């Protein structure tokens, strides 16, 4: 699967899509592939504050449990409730159906500090 050019990426394998003063966050195709079949997703409550580089949830796969690290700081304004009933969406559609949270940014400049698709591809040795 190609790496979408319209997103930014963290070194912890989260992606960020900017929508005005909000961002949508999920995990990358590379990350879900490394984790294997996802069986459970734990996400914060709407209204919670998340801090860049700090854990904000976790994903459990048949192999392991992995923390999700916030690529930006802000207030959670929406959570993808479908993932509680269908965690496998993370494997099936990491960039579309399996977004995890929407966050109102506290500092929009944090997005610009994230990796471009090209830099993320280099980091993960993907074409």
From Swiss-Prot:
PANTHER family: GLYCINE CLEAVAGE SYSTEM H PROTEIN (PTHR11715), GLYCINE CLEAVAGE SYSTEM H PROTEIN-RELATED (PTHR11715:SF3). The modification N6-lipoyllysine is found at residue 63. The keyword Ligase does not apply. The glycine cleavage system is composed of four proteins: P, T, L and H. GO terms for biological process: glycine decarboxylation via glycine cleavage system. The gene is gcvH. Coiled coil: none annotated. The glycine cleavage system catalyzes the degradation of glycine. The H protein shuttles the methylamine group of glycine from the P protein to the T protein. Is also involved in protein lipoylation via its role as an octanoyl/lipoyl carrier protein intermediate. It holds the Pfam family GCV_H. GO terms for cellular component: cytosol; glycine cleavage complex. PROSITE patterns: BIOTINYL_LIPOYL (PS50968), LIPOYL (PS00189). The keyword Ubl conjugation does not apply. Belongs to the GcvH family. The lineage of its organism: Bacteria, Bacillati, Bacillota, Bacilli, Bacillales. Keywords: Lipoyl. Residues 22-104 form the Lipoyl-binding domain. Binds 1 lipoyl cofactor covalently. Its cofactor is (R)-lipoate. InterPro entries: 2-oxoA_DH_lipoyl-BS (IPR003016), Biotin_lipoyl (IPR000089), GCV_H (IPR002930), GCV_H/Fam206 (IPR033753), GCV_H_sub (IPR017453), Single_hybrid_motif (IPR011053). This is Glycine cleavage system H protein.
């Amino acid at each position: 699967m190609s790496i979408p050019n319209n997103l930014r990426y963290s070194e912890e394998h989260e992606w960020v899509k900017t929508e005005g003063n909000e961002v949508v966050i999920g995990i990358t195709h590379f990350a879900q592939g490394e984790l294997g079949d996802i069986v459970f997703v734990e996400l914060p409550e709407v209204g919670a504050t998340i801090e860049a580089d700090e854990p904000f949830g976790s994903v459990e796969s048949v192999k392991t449990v992995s923390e999700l690290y916030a690529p930006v700081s802000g207030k959670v304004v929406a959570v993808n409730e479908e993932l509680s009933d269908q965690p496998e969406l993370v494997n099936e559609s990491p960039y579309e159906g399996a977004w995890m949270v929407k966050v109102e940014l506290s500092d929009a400049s944090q997005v610009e500090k994230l990796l471009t698709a090209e830099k993320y591809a280099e980091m993960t040795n993907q074409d």
